[in-house]
Amino acid sequence: AKGTFYLYFKDKYDIRHRLIANKASRLFERAEEAMRKEEFSTLEEKVVFLVNHVVDQLNENKALMRFISKNLSWAVFSHIRISNMGNIKCMDIFDEILGESNRKFRQKELMIYMIVELVSASCYSVILYGTPCSLEELKAELDKTICGLLKQFEVE
């Protein structure tokens, strides 16, 4: 019944945001777990690995790609919590990776926002429709662009 629904959710958008947050948190949880099993020599390698792992998961599940990409706003992303990892936020994963590098960055949240939005926007058509290039071609360019963004925001 409609009344029962509102005991758990504010409105239909609340349930959608919670579903998106749940699915997105699982993507990041898997990517972070896989990243921890590997060894990297640079911050760039870690970030690129994390991003590529998420992209590969979305490529394997196109329905999830459609659902998440159309509805994942920055406000939702920046507050997604990963319950299997002590309820940390997805943003905390990025903060931890950046902190481990012992490098300083200006406007970290803006930098992460730009990476997330770049990847989300550019992968949509490539994953779902195979245009304007293959996913492997796009990932090669994204890798360079992500490294460039990290360099651009680094404080010397």
Model region roles, listed by residue range:
Residues K12, L19, K23-L27, L50, ...:
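Hydrophobic/aromatic residues within well-ordered alpha-helical segments
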Residues A1-D14, R18:
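Helix-turn-helix
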Residues L19, K23, L27, A31, ...:
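Hydrophobic recognition helices of helix-based DNA-binding modules
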Residues E32-F40, A63, K70-S73, G99-R103, ...:
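Short, flexible helix-adjacent loops and helix caps
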Residues R18, N22, E32-E60, I115:
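Hydrophobic alpha-helical connector segments
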Residues L98-T145, F153-E156:
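Hydrophobic/aromatic-rich alpha-helical bundle segments in the mid-to-C-terminal region
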Residues D56-S78, D95, A121-L128:
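Amphipathic alpha-helical segments used for helix-helix packing
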Residues S25, E29, Q57, A75-N102, ...:
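Amphipathic alpha-helical packing segments from all-alpha helical-bundle domains
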